[in-house]
């Protein structure tokens, strides 16, 4: 039984414990965690829903004391078991942070695995674009955790991600695209990534992806999707990878037919959805419809044209004709300017059930909705 709507993480309503079992004292009422941001979600083959988010214990700020919280539901989003899945280093009580999760659920060598990737800092007190002197920045890291027990426990994966960024020589820091990655038809794992380039590179922010066959050894393509940056999602379509990117105003979309060496505009999705001033993260996935694919997308309409990022909505993209349809304004509210508008979609077709879920920011909380009722309309848009 799936609930239509529920609160996953409640602002000033959650208590967590640290690695030693001690209560983490936040600045929220009664010592609770103050604010939650940046939701990511995946649905497993068992129908389990796993949601990740920044647990911003003391303030909504990006530069603050942050852990990665995880919530797990086995009853379709009705109830949630919550904990900290990834702890920061506890080096700086004000600035140590792991943040901006991106997740994948995939079959890796015969075992269903959840991967979640987060950025890590300890001392930087400004936005990451302010640190472009070194490649990579010495305070930055990008870490990966996994679960092989349906989201019950998580452990760190020792990867070469930091090494490939160091070897590149032009990247100061790199983050996941935020939200979800994917497993390609050939089995490769793909995380969308956004990166800050060093000062000698004209464009500060670029996007791309990293890929792996085993979740341990990762590679970075030789090219970049340049000129547009910040949060992005990757989908697979007609032997290409398509990049959907946050932009101030109309969202941008580019495709690569040579696995990340070169990128060209992708007209069916490029400049189709307007997030207005400042832009906002969005979530883009594909849903099968017969022998075709439809892209489902969620992001804020941002009717006030500011950081309140109102009206988080669901869209369907016809990837062949380029038409786009607004399906549902599922959060028709004005957000909190301290942090608002982010969302993540998850589609799953299991033996007995087909689901479409969304999680999103709601005034410092993370909420869940079941959008499966829209699947017939979305699938007709092919």
From Swiss-Prot:
It is an enzyme of class 3 (hydrolase). Its EC number is 3.2.1.18. Keywords: Disulfide bond, Glycosidase, Hydrolase, Repeat. Gene3D superfamilies: 2.120.10.10. Transmembrane segments: none annotated. The active site is at 62 (proton acceptor), 342 (nucleophile), 361. One of its GO terms (cellular component) is membrane. InterPro entries: Sialidase, Sialidase_fam, Sialidase_sf, Sialidase_trypan. SUPFAM superfamilies: Sialidases. Disulfide bonds join 42-103. BNR repeats lie at residues 71-82, 145-156, 210-220, 254-265. The keyword Electron transport does not apply. Coiled coil: none annotated. Pfam families: BNR_3. GO terms for molecular function: exo-alpha-sialidase activity. It catalyses: Hydrolysis of alpha-(2->3)-, alpha-(2->6)-, alpha-(2->8)- glycosidic linkages of terminal sialic acid residues in oligosaccharides, glycoproteins, glycolipids, colominic acid and synthetic substrates. GO terms for biological process: ganglioside catabolic process; oligosaccharide catabolic process. Belongs to the glycosyl hydrolase 33 family. Cleaves the terminal sialic acid (N-acetyl neuraminic acid) from carbohydrate chains in glycoproteins providing free sialic acid which can be used as carbon and energy sources. Sialidases have been suggested to be pathogenic factors in microbial infections. Monomer. This is Sialidase.
């Amino acid at each position: 039984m799936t609930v239509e709507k529920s609160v996953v993480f409640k602002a000033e309503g959650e208590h967590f414990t640290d690695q030693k079992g001690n209560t983490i004292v936040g600045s929220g009422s009664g010592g609770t965690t103050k604010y939650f941001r940046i939701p990511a979600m995946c649905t497993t083959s068992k129908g389990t829903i796993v949601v990740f988010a920044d647990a911003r214990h003391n303030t909504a700020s990006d530069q603050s004391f942050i852990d990665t919280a995880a919530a797990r539901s086995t009853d379709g989003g009705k109830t949630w078991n919550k904990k900290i899945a990834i702890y920061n280093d506890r080096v700086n009580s004000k600035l140590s942070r792991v943040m901006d999760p991106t997740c994948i659920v995939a079959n890796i060598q015969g075992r269903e695995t959840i991967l979640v990737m987060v950025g890590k800092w300890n001392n930087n007190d400004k936005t990451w674009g302010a640190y472009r002197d070194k490649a990579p920045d010495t305070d930055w890291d990008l870490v990966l955790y996994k679960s092989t027990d349906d989201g019950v426990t998580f452990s760190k994966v020792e990867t070469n991600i930091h090494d490939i960024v160091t070897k590149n020589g032009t990247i100061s820091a790199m983050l996941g695209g935020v939200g979800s990655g994917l497993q390609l038809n050939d089995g490769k794992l793909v995380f969308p990534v956004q990166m800050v380039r060093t000062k000698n590179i004209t464009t500060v922010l670029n996007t791309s992806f990293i890929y792996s066959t085993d979740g341990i050894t990762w590679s970075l393509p030789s090219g970049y999707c340049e000129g547009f940056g910040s949060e992005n999602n990757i989908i697979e379509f007609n032997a290409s990878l398509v990049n959907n990117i946050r932009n101030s105003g109309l969202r941008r979309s580019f495709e690569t037919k040579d696995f990340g060496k070169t990128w060209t505009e992708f007209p069916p999705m490029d400049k189709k959805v307007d997030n207005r001033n400042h832009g906002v993260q969005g979530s883009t996935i594909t849903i099968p419809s017969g022998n075709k694919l439809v892209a489902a997308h969620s992001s804020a309409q941002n009717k006030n044209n500011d950081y309140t990022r109102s009206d988080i909505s669901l869209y369907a993209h016809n990837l062949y004709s380029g038409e786009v349809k607004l399906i549902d304004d599922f959060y028709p509210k004005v957000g909190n300017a301290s942090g608002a508008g982010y969302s993540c979609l998850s589609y799953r077709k299991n033996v007995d059930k087909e689901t479409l879920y969304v999680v999103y920011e709601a005034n410092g909380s993370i909420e869940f909705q079941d959008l499966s009722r829209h699947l017939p309309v979305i699938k007709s848009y092919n």
